[in-house]
Amino acid sequence: MARQLAILLLFAVAMAGIATVGSIESASAAGAIGGQFTLGAVLDESVGWFIVVGLGAVFAVVISLEIKIEEKYLGVTKTSEWFNTAGRVIKTGLTAAAIVSAWTWAATLLQSSTVAYQYGVSGPFWYAAGASVQVLLFGILAIELKRKAPNAHTFLEIIRARFGDAAHRVFLVFALMTNMIVTAMLLLGGAAVVNGLTGMNISIAAFLIPIGVMIYTLVGGLKATFVADYMHTIVIFAVILTFVSTVYFISPVTGGVQGMYDKLVQAAAINPVQGNAAGAYLTMASLGGLIFGIINLVGNFGTVFVDQAYWQRAIAARPSSTVKGFLLGGMCWFAIPFTLATTMGLTAVALGVTLTPEQVQLGLTVPAAASVLMGEVGAIMVLTMLFMAVTSAGSAELIAVSSLITYDVYRTYRNPNATGKQLLKVSRGVIVGFGLGMGGLAVILLSIGLSLGFVYLAMGVLIGSAVIPIALTITWKRTNKYAATAGAIVGLFAALGAWIGTAVALPQYGGVVSIASLGDNFSMLYGNVTGILVGGAITGFGSLGKRSTFEWTDISKKITLVESSSAASVSQADQDEATLKRAFRFSLKGGGLMTLVLIIGWPLPLFFSGYVFDVGFYGLWVGIAVVWVSTATFFIVGLPIIEARHGISKIARRQRAVAEEATGVEK
């Protein structure tokens, strides 16, 4: 049912895109296309309330119904294991869709276009490449989890089984801090855009956005978030395809590829980009873009490797689908920021959209470009797309925090003999508590003047030091608890020292520590890089001094299921060691090769050559973006339906049998 409704949603959004063709000329005639964006003046405030409350309620009802139908017709039993692991039987397509959705934050849609507006074509590329390789490489850890801890509910259970309570508590702090940072970014971006387009009170928006998410997550747990991920991702891809079609193939205002090229060349002549070759927007030779790329690359390792949401997707996936799901998800996700920002971020530049520095930092480039180009239709589409991203990624964070508190706090320290019913009750209580607290956190950050852009760049400073210790704990037999714990803690303080020290040393800020000096690219760069390198060095060198006698089989003995289930037994039957080793080797080769291409082989020759795109190369660049997002849409929309065909037909047969029984018809 949910997948059929998702297809209808795709059709509806596509029809809205077609209707946009006629709206562009009328918007132009009305003066909508004039390069000006007025905060809060694009849409009526009632539209904001409809999206935040009305659309949230619709998705909460639809997704809850889908979960109830699965329970009724597929015999799904709602236990604490099922609630937090989705039965460990999710297939490749839905795993990939869930990864794409969980990794599509407000920042994916907003910050990627911000750096396009600031640095030109290099911004979208470095955002996409610098944030997709983590997912590609995480596939290695995901399959190692399947091999070494098939019964795990969280990655922290593995740390405790190997290193004990002290290390477990340290990494629990890092994990919860990661969830808070990601949640804050989601709501900062979402509330800012709702306020910027409709004038709805930003604090009220921040409080209301999580409510619908909270409802369907309460009903269906992790499986509900997977269903929501799929449906929301369809809408996001449909909106992006509509923008691409409008800018490059339909709109007379942008003039297609040739028109965009001419406008971007003219924009660079009027306002050259400092640090870019020839001041051009159409070049990868951008110092600012490269610095952002490094910060982005380092910072995002923390928000994947230290975020329970991604470990939870690895836990929920079938062992045979884990690596394929992460590799496919990573490559499909690349298309979202790369194509959207290459399209809408550069459209804002081409049309001369004027934004204040504060509006840029709030991430309002995409809504401004869509509003100026397409009027109210564009604004509504951006608002809908952003709401989909915030709520789907938000649901992933909700269930992640729920699992951490349930299994790593309550079951570990409060009630080791807890029953499944007790754990389920705790899980739901945490969802309500964290769901209500999410908005409060965003309001606090807004009140002290922190924007989406600032929090996005600072996250690696705060959590990057835990990345390598966690990765080595899962993959390296010689890692010891003292080195891993010290690496995470000392790395954090070293990162903070480098961050603050650089901010003080920058002469343009007069030696004052402020949001402006801390938000400078060089302050962020040194803080992010210091954290991950110091944490990794202490863990690596500290572990070399002592040979470990640890056996991986000890982990699986220490981590047990709360309840046995048919889903769990299916997962165990899929747990063939030879198959998992082949998957591990494939993840090393596939993830490693794609990382080298995206970080070195593709961008660096273009950077060092100083090449400025001509119209032909720009057309090729746009063509790659269009083909990539179209292919990604095909896989993310189509593959889950293909893989779910047997379940769909089973539901249809049982519904038909029930209907025939009710009407007294003989089979």
What are the residue ranges of the model-derived segments?
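Membrane-embedded helix-loop-helix hairpins and adjacent transmembrane boundary segments
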Residues: 2-667
